[in-house]
């Protein structure tokens, strides 16, 4: 029996679907990371970023999202982590999130350069590693801790829902 080959359009339509996002890990010299509070979710904080638009690649998305959310023109640094999040019980498709080094910012620079989009964000802060677990959702806290290690150690890590599966944890 010979294998059946689908026409390209049918084959591509049959492949699994996922969504993608990109985030910026913006930090200061003391290791604090810039966190933002979404206007639509006041119980937790996040890092700047968001979903990729159709036809957009992750670097374009992180630049656009940081510009929209913070008013900052960002030139992202290296890729720190890729985080795969499986399909959720609420029906959200699988997510692949690309996390980039967003560079250094001082408290003084942040005060003058950050202009929040009030429709998206209500506040920002430079948070210490000790604050991350209480401010961030558990998967986001794991993600930020992993990105901090990746920056310090010069690594890129692979995560699954924030868990580092590269075996390089310290």
Task: Describe the predicted segments one by one.
Residues 43, 118-170:
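Nudix hydrolase/Nudix homology domain
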Residues 18, 43, 94-96:
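Residue-level preference for beta-strand/loop junctions
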Residues 16, 43-44, 83-88:
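Short, solvent-exposed loop/turn segments at secondary-structure junctions
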Residues 17-19, 28, 92, 119:
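A generic fold-level signal
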Residues 52-75, 84-140:
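Unchanged
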Residues 28-68, 163:
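Conserved Nudix-box catalytic region and its N-terminal flanking loop in Nudix hydrolases
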Residues 1-23:
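Acidic, metal-coordinating catalytic segment for phosphate/diphosphate chemistry
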């Amino acid at each position: 029996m010979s294998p059946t080959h689908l026409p390209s359009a049918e084959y591509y339509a049959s492949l699994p679907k996922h969504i993608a996002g990109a985030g910026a890990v913006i930090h200061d010299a003391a290791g604090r990371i810039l966190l933002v509070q979404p206007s639509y979710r006041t119980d937790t904080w996040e890092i700047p970023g968001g979903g990729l638009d159709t036809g957009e690649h992750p670097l374009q998305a992180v630049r656009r999202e940081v510009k929209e959310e913070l008013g900052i023109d960002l030139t992202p640094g290296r890729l720190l982590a890729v985080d795969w999040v499986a399909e959720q019980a609420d029906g959200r498709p699988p997510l692949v999130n690309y996390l980039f080094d967003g560079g250094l910012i001082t408290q003084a620079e942040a005060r003058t350069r950050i202009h929040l989009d009030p429709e998206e964000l209500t506040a920002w802060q430079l948070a210490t590693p000790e604050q991350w677990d209480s401010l961030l959702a558990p998967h986001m806290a794991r993600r930020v801790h992993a990105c901090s290690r990746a920056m310090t150690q010069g690594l890129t890590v692979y995560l699954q829902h924030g868990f580092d599966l590269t075996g390089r944890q310290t």
